[in-house]
């Protein structure tokens, strides 16, 4: 089993979600290095990364400590108030399942937009130095926030020189939606809560490593 929030968890989650929303043939891809997801049969490589987020790591710890232990929301909130005082996210229940988000309400995205743009530029440098090349080279970014809009993604893309950009596609994972930039336009793909739970559980139990 993979620990939620670990590097391999993110890689497995990215692969599982891409199989569902983009290319089912990626089921044969392997989790390797440089890039993280490699499908040699179809010549597709996907590098996976995530923006740093202390609240996200705290949410993962809360989920590990409190979820799947027959605790109701009041019990969980009491534990959070006692042991995770700086947590600023939200915990909720829907159709008998409990969910946790590391953020809530309106946020100033300027810092987050800067962070994502910087990460993309760093990945471009690394790609040009020592990454294996495929016919299709993609980048998958966990943004850890459901409030990003198409406009936010467009702003991020505007900070990139596409004339020397090595990736064919960029997937921006924004929790309940994934934005796909194909060098021409940004498409929004909505992900249901049921699928979010499925992706998570499949990633936790991913064993083809």
Cite the ranges covered by each PLM segment.
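Conserved catalytic cores of phosphodiester-cleaving nucleases, focusing on short active-site segments
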Residues: 37, 44-50
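Metal-dependent nuclease catalytic core centered on acidic motifs
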Residues: 1-30, 49-209
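Alpha-helix C-terminal capping segments
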Residues: 18-19, 37-39
